[in-house]
């Protein structure tokens, strides 16, 4: 196996019932492995019955209704257990896993494990988070920092945004493109890059908190923990 994390790269994404990581439920999930050219070589897909109503707003984003999840989805506990198992197996193989805005997906997965009386994923590392990388490498670029915009900036096709598989694969390809554009900063050993992202995310959150306190709410707080909050 290559020493470059971006030559064989895991990718992961969730679609869920909402934005609160403590209370939202997994609706669909995708894990894949990309080769050095961004081609998909392995994949796992899940559709879950979250056990609760999927809000209309969430369904509008990812296209999965409560009715479909109940009819076609598997029990949440089974899905969560399998996701944790596959992620753990990728880390055991020495692969890094790309997750765009990792604290959302990994924190939600952590709370889903607890909710279903499962052991949470152990230390998830190494993680590659293109959102953190993009903010660190191109700090002053104007515009949104969504996956859709990042894909456009780094020349990656994203034709079905908010589908777990499309988002996961695009995030991985963005990470690969960034590593090739900025090798001095990003083409380093995966665990070293993981540690750098811990520091970068803390700095980014502190800057955002300072901005919000100056311009909107003097009591605003945000967590800089990464990759799990």
Regions inferred by a protein language model and the residue ranges of each:
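DEDD superfamily 3′-5′ metal-dependent exonuclease/proofreading module
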Residues: 1-27, 34-42, 64, 70-229
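Residues at the C-termini of beta-strands that transition into short coil/loop
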Residues: 30, 47-50, 131
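Short, surface-exposed acidic-centric catalytic microdomains
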Residues: 42-62
């Amino acid at each position: 196996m290559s020493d470059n994390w971006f030559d064989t790269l895991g990718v992961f994404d969730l679609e869920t019932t909402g934005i609160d990581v403590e209370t939202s439920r997994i609706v669909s999930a995708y894990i894949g492995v990309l080769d050095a050219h961004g081609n998909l070589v392995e994949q796992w897909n899940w559709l879950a019955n979250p056990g609760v109503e999927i809000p209309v707003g969430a369904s509008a984003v990812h296209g999965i209704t409560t009715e479909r999840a109940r009819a076609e989805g598997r029990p949440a506990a089974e899905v969560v257990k399998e996701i944790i198992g596959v992620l753990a197996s990728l880390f055991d193989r020495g692969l890094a896993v790309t997750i765009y805005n990792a604290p959302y997906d990994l924190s939600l997965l952590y709370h889903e494990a607890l909710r279903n009386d499962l052991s949470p994923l152990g230390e998830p590392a190494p993680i590659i988070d293109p959102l953190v990388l993009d903010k660190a490498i191109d700090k002053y670029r104007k515009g949104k920092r969504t996956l859709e915009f990042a894909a456009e900036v780094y020349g990656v096709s994203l034709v079905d945004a908010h589908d777990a598989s499309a988002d996961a694969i695009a995030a991985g390809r963005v990470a690969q493109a960034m590593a090739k554009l900025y090798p001095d900063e990003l083409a380093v050993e995966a665990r070293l890059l993981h540690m750098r992202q811990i520091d970068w995310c803390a700095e980014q959150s502190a800057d955002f908190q300072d901005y919000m306190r100056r311009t909107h709410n003097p009591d605003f707080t945000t967590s800089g923990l990464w990759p799990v909050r």
